[in-house]
Amino acid sequence: MAKKITAYIKLQVKAAQANPSPPVGPALGQHGVNIMEFCKAFNARTQGLEAGLPTPVIITVYSDRSFTFETKSTPASVLLKKAAGLTSGSARPNTVKVGTVTRAQLEEIAKTKNADLTAADMDAAVRTIAGSARSMGLNVEGV
């Protein structure tokens, strides 16, 4: 018989830097999950990623207080800010442009995000990422 699911927890945790402090500790503690066990497993799974990049994770908690988790790719906005060398996007993206990204940079981000995108092919994925860039106030070259 399958285990009964009691909760889904969605968090963004820095890759290879999970620790029991907020937001991880309180979110898992209220569901009775072993926090240190999650932190060790998460850090081991995200070891290959660049340390410090926020990584979305969906934790499934079962009735016996066990858990499984699935990591997603880093949000496109974080990757775009990194590619453009910015700390934040534009407060007024349609009037004030704060940086520029090239098609090559967009293709690299699309390859990273491809597993989480619903695009039919790489060109559609690049256009999706380009739309995210424009909504952040970035100029897009070559698309």
UniProtKB/Swiss-Prot annotation:
A biological-process GO annotation: translation
Cross-referenced Pfam families: Ribosomal_L11, Ribosomal_L11_N
Gene Ontology MF term list: large ribosomal subunit rRNA binding; structural constituent of ribosome
KW Membrane (keyword) present: no
Keyword DNA-binding among UniProt keywords: no
Domain of life: Bacteria
GO cellular component term, pick one: cytosolic large ribosomal subunit
Gene3D superfamilies reported in the protein's UniProt record: Ribosomal protein L11, C-terminal domain (1.10.10.250), Ribosomal protein L11/L12, N-terminal domain (3.30.1550.10)
Reported modifications of this chain: One or more lysine residues are methylated.
Keywords attached to this entry: Methylation, Ribonucleoprotein, Ribosomal protein, RNA-binding, rRNA-binding
Listed HAMAP family: Ribosomal_uL11
Family: Belongs to the universal ribosomal protein uL11 family.
Subunit and partners: Part of the ribosomal stalk of the 50S ribosomal subunit. Interacts with L10 and the large rRNA to form the base of the stalk. L10 forms an elongated spine to which L12 dimers bind in a sequential fashion forming a multimeric L10(L12)X complex.
Role according to the record: Forms part of the ribosomal stalk which helps the ribosome interact with GTP-bound translation factors.
Name by which UniProt lists this protein: Large ribosomal subunit protein uL11
